[in-house]
Amino acid sequence: MESDLDKNWSGHALWRRLLRRVPADSACDQEAVVIAFGSGKGGTGKSFLTTNLAIGLHQRGLRVVVVDCDFGLANAHLLLRSTPRYSMQHLLCGQRTIDEVLTKTDFGPSLVAGGSGISSLAELDAKHMQMLAHALRQLAARFDVLLIDCAAGLAPQSMITLLVAHHVVMVTNPEIAALTDAYAVIKCLSRQAARPAIQVVVNRTASRSLGRATFERLSSVSRRFASLPLHYLGAVPEDAAVSHRRLSQAPMLVEMPECETSTALSGLAGLLERFALEERMHPGSLDVESRMLAQIRRW
C-alpha cells in the first residue's frame, strides 16, 4: 500500500488494546475518532469504500459505526446487506431514539442508515443539524471509530460534517469530472480556518501507479490554487471481478478477501487504524457535537 505514511507500520496487539476503551455501557470522556468520507460527484465508490473499510477496522478489533449522512440517496445499508427498520430520518423527526436507529450488521460494524428517496432530508435546517450533532456525540461515546458517509458535492450539511471530522477521506477516480469536482470540495474546505487533514483515495483505478499519478495532479492544483496540501492515502485498483458483482453479494472484504481490490482495502483499513491510534493519544479539547455546533454558527 503506497502512502505518505510509514509503510512499515503495523498495529501491534498492545496498541490495539490502547485503542479500545472501557465497555460501551460505561461512562467515558474520550470519544470516537471521526473519519468523514466525501467526494465531488456521485459514482466514485465512496460508500463502497466506507462500508468495506468499516469491516476492515472491525476485523482489527475496533468498535466501528457507519453513519450514512447521504440523506435522500443513502445506500450504505444495501452495501452492508442490512434492512434496518428505522433510519436517521426517524431520529431527526423525533420519532425514534439513537438506540432504535442503531443497527448491528452481520459483518461486524454497526450502522445508522440515512434514509433513501426522502427529499426533505436533502437540506437540513439548523435545528435538524443540531439534532444530528447530538446524535453523533451519542454515537461517539460508544464506539472507537465513527465513519461518516457524506453526500457528494457542496451542500452545506455535507461541508459542515466534513469539517467536524478528525480526518477527511476524499474519494475520487482518474476521470476528469471526478477530479474537477473533488477539487471544488477541497477548495471550499480550504477557506475554513479550522479544517481537518485531507487524505485522498483514488478509487477504481487501472493500477496503483495510475492512482498515484492521479493524486499528484489533484495535489498540484490544490497546492497552487487553494494553498492546501493533500495527503495520499492510497489507490484501490478495480479488480475485474468487482464490476460483475451484485448488491446481493456480501461486501468485497468478506466475499473476496484475496483479490487485488480487497488487498488494497485492507491496507487502507490499517492506515485508518493508525489515524485512530494517533488521535486517541492526542485528543482534542472539543467533542464532535461542540465542533459541529461551532461550524453551524459560522456557516
Region annotations inferred by a language model:
Residues 179-194:
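Conserved C-terminal guanine-recognition region of P-loop GTPase G domains, centered on the G4
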